[in-house]
Amino acid sequence: MEGVTKYGSGGRLRHSGLEETNYIYKNLVTGYPYSFENAIAGKTGTTQNQSDGWFMGMVPNLVTGVWVGGEDRSIHFEDIAFGQGATMALPIWGKYMKDAYLNPDLGISSEAFPIPELVSIPLDCENLNIESSKKKKDLEDLGF
């Protein structure tokens, strides 16, 4: 999760000072700097013809999503620079979260994500061709 919160969409949401360093990035990719200081994770998504974009964002006690698009598939952006989740949906989510954090009664977490006590997945690289029923059982044993 640290990779997403530090370097992925979360890093982009928290980054401030863009106005001094990269005007194009600030105005075209993020819309404006959000300057969140807390841990945030998220994932953007885009349809192949740039008619839909979405962003799913999360903090430790809240997951929310924003979808931008239309039912008529012929309506779409001609260019991926504007027709993607990062430029269509992410700015809406950022504004929503900024406003949500202004209301302490909502109790939205600004803490770090809890670290799991133990995450362990055994790998047997020498026996990659094991039968699929064994693979399925292994995944079920892990809770998947």
Indicate where each model-derived feature is located.
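Secreted/processed peptides and extracellular or luminal domains of membrane proteins
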Residues: 130-133
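Extended acidic low-complexity intrinsically disordered regions
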Residues: 135-144
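A penicillin-recognizing enzyme superfamily signal
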Residues: 1-128, 142
